[in-house]
């Protein structure tokens, strides 16, 4: 076989590294090339002189390697023989090991069989032991049962309740162990004997117990009798407990029966005192110690007393309901709560049973007496308040206060309501349920106060005159509108202050009640008070506004056609300024601590005056260009003055609110635009209409007709202008013009409805406007006919 060359050998990297380490000598360095080694040995020509010595050294090294190889070959010549011998020894050892394992396996099998036999024997012994133990136990129980039944018969005859109490529970428990053997004659016989003994014992025990308590012979023997009663099956214990409690409460049932005079609510504390004495005697006499502790005889006696008392009180209150009043009811409830607190302290809550509200709850059915009484009290309070206000006793005086203050009765009312709510929470065992009923009473009271004590005393402007006759008298005779006196103004401001305070307090009351009872709502009453503040403001506005009626009415009486030049402002502006300078500061002082209402007052006043001024302009007929210019100047003067009304004659000259400025500007800017339209030429209808739409884009045909009348345009020429206007704005040209509208439709939107807050002054202005519109060019006879028709319509309207 050809030996593999060195290049064919494939050795691992580790082997190659070891060989490399072994081959490194002084002249053998595998990691260097042959040329590098020669250059290292002979770096120069002069080093060639050492060639012989180096050759000798290399030959010496070769000889050492040969010797080493010869030694290795010699020492490893017999390696294969030793390996074969070692392999044979290993095989022999494996054979011996297999024999040993087989022997161990055989011995293990025999051991398992021995263990199974031993386990089977142990189980048989255990079964035998259990059977023997059960037999011995059964025999022992049977012995106990036999001797127990025999002894029990003797004890019953001797009335040895101590022994019976000790052994009877054990005998009964043992008998239960023989339930599976009741078919056995002996067990059935023993069970029958025991039943007869229990029946005899039950009758005898009940008789002896009652006799012992009736004769008062109390001893430890009674405790044994009670233990026997507890051990006996059936209702022996419960029947005796019921009899004992009835005996203890028999006197109470007679003394405080519902037909006895002492049973009425005014003496309810006597019945509670009686039971406290009875319970004290019960414990002092040691009765609580005679009965077993688990009977809780004191607690059960108290519970029965509460039940009996609750039934008696319900019957007597039902029978004498007409005699109930809430103070008597409150007296009884107060003593009942005190008694229940005493019971709760003596007998704390146990097993979910408590004496809290044990009797108290019976009164809840009759608390409508409290509700009715509070309704009566509050109604009387409201009547008293109204009487005081009417007599002047309640009215605040201008001398005592510089500004309006709430009526003292408003604070008294809320204090009374608070007292009612507090009382209700003390009376009912379910206070939330009663408070819900009380809230209804509170709401009625608030509404009653708002109506009878506030609204009823708001001055009614023009109350001396009413109906259509009054309206026509104002038109024909121009009767002066009645004004409020300073005291009446102060009263109105006080009513406003009272309503505002009541509204804010009602909100606070609702928040407090909602914390306790979610869903409480008295917002309607709050809104009623806020509505009164608005009505009060309206009365003040109408009063101050009426001072300017004469000045506004004078506008339509001026012959504006004859005005040929523009001068200073017209007299009516000065008149209005003088009246407002006199009236507004007084109202401001009266409402000094309620600035928001004064601001609202100014807004209403300025807005209504501005609209009235526009209405007065519409009633002017045939205004010349100079007349329109004069009115334009007057309008600017009026606007400037109205913007200064909130701070008129005030030390502090503050800027008016934005809403106020916007409202005044909007109303009087329209007046300026109307006057500018009046100044426009009507030579060309289309140009006039375009100018009208430009200046008054939000106008309508009815308003345009009034503007034409202001310009003095003849009525027969109105149709052409109005039709052009309708075509321009896209309306139908076939609609009838304003002059053909029925009188009924015209007054429907102008007259105030009955019961509204509109004043007679507003009605006057509306009537004058329509009278001027409809009667301007009519004959006297026709005017009278139309006025009669108009009067009939007004009567129906009012």
From Swiss-Prot:
Keywords: Cytoplasm, Endosome, Golgi apparatus, Membrane. Disruption phenotype: Mutants are viable but display reduced brood size and enlarged lysosomes. Egg-laying defect, slow, but coordinated locomotion, and reduced levels of unprocessed and processed cargo in the motor neuron axon of the dorsal nerve cord. GO terms for cellular component: cytosol; endosome membrane; GARP complex; perikaryon; perinuclear region of cytoplasm. GO terms for biological process: negative regulation of dense core granule transport; positive regulation of dense core granule transport; positive regulation of locomotion involved in locomotory behavior; regulation of brood size; retrograde transport, endosome to Golgi. Pfam families: VPS53_C, Vps53_N. It is found in: Golgi apparatus, trans-Golgi network membrane; Endosome membrane; Perikaryon; Cytoplasm, Perinuclear region. Ubiquitously expressed, with particularly strong expression in neuronal cells. Specifically expressed in head and tail neurons and in the pharynx and ventral cord motor neurons. It comes from the Eukaryota. Belongs to the VPS53 family. Component of the Golgi-associated retrograde protein (GARP) complex, also called VFT (VPS fifty-three) complex, composed of vps-51, vps-52, vps-53 and vps-54. Within the complex interacts with vps-51, vps-52 and vps-54. Acts as a component of the GARP complex that is involved in retrograde transport from early and late endosomes to the trans-Golgi network (TGN). The GARP complex facilitates tethering as well as SNARE complex assembly at the Golgi. Plays a role in the trafficking of cargo to dense-core vesicles, probably through association with the EARP-interacting protein eipr-1. Important for neuronal function. This is Vacuolar protein sorting-associated protein 53 homolog. It comes from Caenorhabditis elegans.
